[in-house]
């Protein structure tokens, strides 16, 4: 089963930013920064589909003149849609 059907990306990503989405069955994808994923259970614009739970880990690093001026890491877990 595919983790999700499509991904929408915003152009001009920040340097050093990335997101990882993985499901409980081990499938996943590494995306560029400023990525947007939208999904739901049975919606018309479902992007993320999972038979179990999934997690989203994001790290954001902002560089100004080669100096890291901002770093932030996020971790979220969700219950996926039953199939």
UniProtKB/Swiss-Prot annotation:
Pfam families cross-referenced by the UniProt entry: Coiled
Q: Name one GO biological process term.
A: sorocarp development
Assigned protein family: Belongs to the hssA/B family.
Protein name per its UniProtKB record:
HssA/B-like protein 43
Q: Which species expresses this protein natively? A: Dictyostelium discoideum
